[in-house]
Design a protein with these regions (language model features):
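N-terminal export leaders
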Residues: 5-13
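Short, low-complexity N-terminal intrinsically disordered segments enriched in polar/charged residues
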Residues: 2, 21-50
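Exposed beta-sheet edge and beta->alpha loop/turn motif
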Residues: 95-146
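Short solvent-exposed beta->alpha transition segments
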Residues: 35-39, 43, 53-102
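Hydrophobic core
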Residues: 13-21
């Protein structure tokens, strides 16, 4: 568990997109924004499923792309460190939220062993109007899928 927490922290520090939100205030997200945000996350998951490194990398913010340098390095990191995101057995999305200025998409994923994971994506709206993923936090849940 400690190793998982270290990996999670390391990934969060590398991507620079996560921070503690203990007293955060959630703001409403329009139906259009929610659909766009979920579509970006779903598209990246689809790219992971197809081992399409270039497409998966295209959904990351410029900051993430700069941190990893290239699509193959990014995909290798996700494949090795985040198998529940790389190849989830199931995905359920919650309604996105805007919390203290951060756009968050939470999801519950199960891995190939049936372990449940809470996944929080941080997204940014780019100047061109496109949503991009700026980080991802993964925390093990208590349950398992039967």
């Amino acid at each position: 568990m400690l190793q998982t927490r270290r990996r999670m922290l390391s990934f969060a520090l590398v991507v620079g997109g996560l921070w503690a939100l203990p007293s955060a205030q959630a703001a409403g997200v329009s139906a259009k924004q929610a659909a766009q945000i979920q579509a970006v996350v779903q598209a990246q998951l689809k790219a992971f499923a197809a081992d399409d490194a270039v497409r998966a990398f295209s959904f990351a913010t410029p900051r993430i792309r700069k941190a990893f340098g290239n699509a193959d390095t990014f995909l290798a990191m996700v494949r090795a460190s985040y198998p529940m995101v790389y190849r989830p057995s199931s995905v359920s999305f919650f309604k996105p939220e805007k919390v203290d200025g951060a756009w968050l998409q939470q999801a519950q994923m199960s891995d190939e062993q049936g372990v449940l994971w809470q996944v929080t994506y941080v997204l940014e709206l780019q100047r061109d109007g496109a949503w991009r993923i700026n980080g991802c936090e993964v925390v093990a849940s208590e349950g398992r899928v039967a």
